[in-house]
């Protein structure tokens, strides 16, 4: 698990300004690190971008949900029908509650995204 001071500062800010979002972000980060223990993490675009050589996903907190973004999500298989987005490349999974992490098979999609880069 490699992160930097910017990651810690953004987490601290989130904890104060969006406690529910902070908890979901932390849970999503745990999933990423459980799948890719050596992932590196940095702050980009107001969220947390994860790389394992190449960027494979990002975690972003919004007022009502947390979004896990996949830059090449268009190439991911979606057997559970949870990927959202209709753009050319990007897809995302919206998390509203901690139970969404398992219900939307986040670990499976993070693993698939990491394997495709």
Label each region the model flagged:
Residues 1-117:
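Charge-dense, helix-prone N-terminal extensions
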């Amino acid at each position: 698990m490699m992160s930097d001071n910017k990651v810690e500062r953004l987490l601290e800010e989130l904890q104060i300004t969006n406690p529910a979002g902070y908890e979901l972000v932390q849970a999503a980060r745990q999933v990423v690190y459980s799948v890719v223990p050596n992932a590196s993490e940095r702050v980009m675009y107001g969220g947390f971008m994860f790389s394992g050589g190449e960027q494979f996903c990002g975690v972003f907190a919004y007022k009502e949900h947390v979004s896990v973004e996949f830059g090449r999500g268009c190439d991911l298989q979606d057997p559970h029908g949870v990927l959202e987005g209709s753009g050319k490349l990007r897809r995302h999974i919206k998390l509203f509650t901690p139970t969404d992490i398992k219900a939307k098979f986040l670990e499976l999609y993070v693993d698939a995204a990491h394997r495709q880069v």
